[in-house]
């Protein structure tokens, strides 16, 4: 088949240098790529180019050296040499792609499910058999069994892509065809082929007969059908063997066999009128509707069908690419009941089955490519499709055949590069292709990714220009803009949050919310009990466990109902506990009333918080970069981990392991209760006393002298003044070891069940359910283990009566009457420290929660959050309850428990993180349950405390995930060759990274020392000190380094942005036409690739160079 040039395909002969072999003269592939001129500054190359600059694929015959100079006088030296030129190379394909892909107003195109069917012959019968399918990655039908292969990355030969390009150039292309059935589509395609002289009219019925054969799909069959098929296949094989002892498999693929059998089959076409030409049903069959694979296909998807095969009656390929105007159900053509939008048909002469199959795989792979699928949907003509293929060729990676086995299936990557990056690349300065850039940018590939694949460049790939290597600027949301108006920020927060208020409730009705509520509830009550007990010891029970429970329930529920960020969980913190202890000691030493003094400090602090809200003081949070965020969150995580381990070690001290126990001396071990020397003979009425083996009522008055002290229990003996005597009296079962099993078992089981989501066992929904309820399952499991053993491990004790811990105080604190008048104004000074502490804790936690990595779509409310924290502080001060502020670790755990991922993902594709389920229901339910925990005390008393310590440990460890500081700390222990491919490691020297990490470690150590001493009262001031330290780092590190390992401070960002803007204006005024080097040329001999003119699919040779000369 002769390859003809089509309209709109222009011949472009770039000026290039080519080195000729002294003894050979043969056609060559010239792979050219434009290089930015060296006279132009690199920093000026970004964003000033129009058109899509592409890698140029050009097949041209050898020319004399004089012809290479070009009509414009452009001269080229050897590859990589400096070249002067004055004209920019622009390709028609670049303009086409820029026009059709530049429209961003349209809705995204549906996901394409692509199925490839190959023509199979069984005797006189023919059918289309499904051989492969794609959603994102390729799945093949295994030849040795009725099963699908694992999803894998499609590996295509470069030659098949060239042949596909030729197919689109020479075949029939029908765009927006208005047909609703397969016979009608085939009739239109055949008619178009006959009109174009590509098919002889007498072959119409033969081609139509082949294309309308039934399709057999690789679907899962019931077990009874599978056994029946096995028996049928065995009997068929026996009959075939009886007819011909040398007979091969049932399906014949050899050319000779096909020719003989097809001639017999087509001989029956004369009787076509007596039987149907169409074997395909118009509606989906039962197998299609029941196919479970439909769950993997996104909603509103469309299908792309690829049909390839070989026949003996064609002397040139029958090629057609069809795009329907509206997707239509084509009956049994597709494996699943998905409407078809695209068809690619390739029927060719016999003997090239493998070549046709590779071309089919190539077009199928392109159809599921994000960018080419957009081109296919928006293409206006044939040239647009060819331009899409050329863009795909720009991104193709070629592996040397001697270094890679194509039979090895490449596992799908964990992170796939976004197609948006490719779509936005319309200039060479931003080109992040594998083949499109050289020089310095090629050495620093993958600007934004954490790996080669993620960055789009990997090893050996071209990166961006100098400016493109910089990461995204530190984005400051509009919530932190200083308005300059009285309560301006608060009013804007309210306006932003009001539209989302109804959805904050109905978005919470999801099964995932149940797991989040139980997880955070257990963390909150554990924290409330621990903090309440410590606070009771520090304040002589003026504030205890009951006050902690009531304050947590009231403050937390009100905050989650009305705050700007309801995902934040309020709790008490260590610095507040230290402040309360110092305040109580000061009041006691100076004869002041502690509760009244504390009330005035809380009122002043609340007023100061409201002043900060009124003046939009929260805008200074934009100066908190990753350096401060990660230092603060890492410190809180370490506190959780340290406290959990410390409490576990305390169990070993309280219940020591019996190292002196000797099993051989068990007969000498005894313990008995001995009566005291003098016993009061008066009677005792004690309901707790129960003498074993007697019928004595528990309420019967007892005479202690009449008791048999040897029958009393340990508790009874000690309560009535008796003494324990014996060598085994100090024996304690190994409660410490059992507590450790419960503690570490809960932590490790939770961690394992969380990772179970990414295992290979059980269906996706089961794994997701187990991962979401991992905390609940772990707690229930180890509570059951503790109950089975029946050991007296420490249990959770919750007050069962709502009353103040101290009997001489009530639920309201009077503001006057117990302290001198000067105490009221003097409390402003300690209130200032509390305000700094509250402000920093609250806003740093809010910044961490509102990170862009969490993909929160509802607006934040920094001013509204601080407003409610101030109001709640005043309310808690009047009621004598603890003060509450945002809890970093529990808030991060709340975020993690509400993360959403794609419900349907393509086989082999990792679930994509969609964001967080933003709502108020979980927070409100957590604190309501905390409040009614008093009535749940009979149930909660069965929960061992070591289990809750394990939950604490998990919270601390889990909150360290995703912190870059922790990743950089681990680099100290890794050799360079084993270090992960983090993005910052590509752009910042390792010694600079270690220096930055050491500074953070020193700051963290200083904060830890302050927290552990009485100087913890100045802890909030030291948080402010972190911001100062970060500003001083600008004197040590460059802005480039800080951009990768931290964030650039706002004023630095503004200066950088202004500098770029001025430079852009100067560039636009002085240099409207950026210059490029002429394409450098690599000569690839084509002598070993034979052309076969008979089938019409081949690489274009000496006289067909224009078919390939698109400068892309």
UniProtKB/Swiss-Prot annotation:
Gene Ontology biological process terms in this record: bicarbonate transport; cerebrospinal fluid secretion; epithelial cell development; mitochondrion distribution; monoatomic anion transport; monoatomic ion transport; regulation of gene expression; regulation of intracellular pH
Cellular-component GO terms for this entry: apical plasma membrane; basolateral plasma membrane; plasma membrane
Query: In Gene Ontology terms, what is one molecular function of this protein?
Result: sodium:bicarbonate symporter activity
List locations, semicolon-separated. Answer: Basolateral cell membrane; Apical cell membrane
Per its record, the protein catalyses: 2 hydrogencarbonate(out) + Na(+)(out) = 2 hydrogencarbonate(in) + Na(+)(in); 3 hydrogencarbonate(out) + Na(+)(out) = 3 hydrogencarbonate(in) + Na(+)(in)
Topological domain (Extracellular) residues are 537-547, 621-734, 793-820, 876-880, 941-945, 1011-1015
Q: Where is this region: Disordered?
A: 1-80, 220-255, 439-469, 1055-1112
Which residues face the membrane's Cytoplasmic side? 1-513, 580-598, 754-772, 840-858, 901-920, 967-992, 1034-1112
Q: Which Cys pairs are S-S linked?
A: none
Transmembrane residues, as ranges?
514-536, 548-579, 599-620, 735-753, 773-792, 821-839, 859-875, 881-900, 921-940, 946-966, 993-1010, 1016-1033
Membrane topology designation: Multi-pass membrane protein
Give me the stretches of Polar residues compositional bias. 53-67, 233-244
- Domain of life here? Eukaryota
Q: Where is the composition biased (Gly residues)?
A: 444-465
Give residue spans, biased composition: Basic and acidic residues.
1-13, 1055-1074
Where expressed (tissue)?
Observed in hepatocytes and in the apical region of bile duct intrahepatic cholangiocytes of liver. Also observed in uroepithelium cells lining the outer pelvic wall of the kidney (at protein level). Highly expressed in colon, distal colon, liver, kidney and testis. Moderate expression in duodenum and stomach and weak expression in heart. In kidney, very weakly expressed in the inner medulla, but abundantly expressed in cortex and outer medulla in the medullary thick ascending and cortical thick ascending limbs of the loop of Henle.
Q: Which UniProt keywords apply?
A: Anion exchange, Cell membrane, Ion transport, Membrane, Sodium, Sodium transport, Transmembrane, Transmembrane helix, Transport
Which NCBIfam families does the annotation name? ae
Report the family membership: Belongs to the anion exchanger (TC 2.A.31) family.
Q: What function is annotated for this protein?
A: Mediates sodium- and bicarbonate-dependent electrogenic sodium bicarbonate cotransport, with a Na(+):HCO3(-) stoichiometry varying from 1:2 to 1:3.
Q: What is this protein called?
A: Electrogenic sodium bicarbonate cotransporter 4
Q: Which gene encodes it?
A: Slc4a5
